[in-house]
Amino acid sequence: MAYPLALRLLEQEGDNGKKICGCVVNLYEKMKAEFPDASLAIDGDYPYGGKAEIKVRSKDDFTVFLRIPHYTAKITLNGRELSCNRGEFLKVINPANEESCLEIFFDLSLKEVSAPGDPAYTAVKRGAVVLAEDSRKKDVPNARVHEEWNGHFLVEYSAAGSCFNKENTLQVFFRA
């Protein structure tokens, strides 16, 4: 059975061979995964929205390791805030025969990132998304992110310059 690339499975040896006992979640895009004795579903609008919700159900204890991005604001388990270290993994155990609801809230404030090798230039990120200025300025069809920064109108990089012609250009780095 194939599982989404966002997941990595954890197995353990049992009396009847290998058994799935957990998973590692690296990305928070909407998905569902069914295992023999558990299920996991992720809902939300990641990477554009500020929250992802993960529901885990299992017949036995089921371990979930969550990658905690640097732009994470907070994480809750069944409404209770958890302590976590950004840039690391958080271990959560779903008890047997229960459903757990994890919510991950992302900080989507704009962050400046210096250009590699030239700190005189800066790119702008919003959570996981790199932003760019499209030569069409505010008229960028299909853009899901619209931000103004230092007089520039920015959209997500994947939408900028999407006309694929000489007149439609994009800019990612700006003089700091």
PLM segments and residue spans:
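C-terminal beta-rich recognition modules with glycine/proline-rich loops and embedded aromatic residues
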Residues: M1-K55, N85, E103-A176
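Beta-strand-rich interaction surfaces with strong enrichment in secreted/lumenal proteins
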Residues: A41-G44, L90-N94
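N-terminal and secondary-structure boundary signal
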Residues: A38, L77, L82, N97-E103
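Solvent-exposed beta-strand/loop surfaces of large extracellular or lumenal domains
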Residues: T72-I93, L110-G117
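Surface-exposed beta-strand/loop patches in extracellular or lumenal glycoproteins
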Residues: K55, D60-P69
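C-terminal beta-strand-rich structural cap/linker in extracellular carbohydrate-active enzymes
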Residues: F62-F65, V92-L108, V113
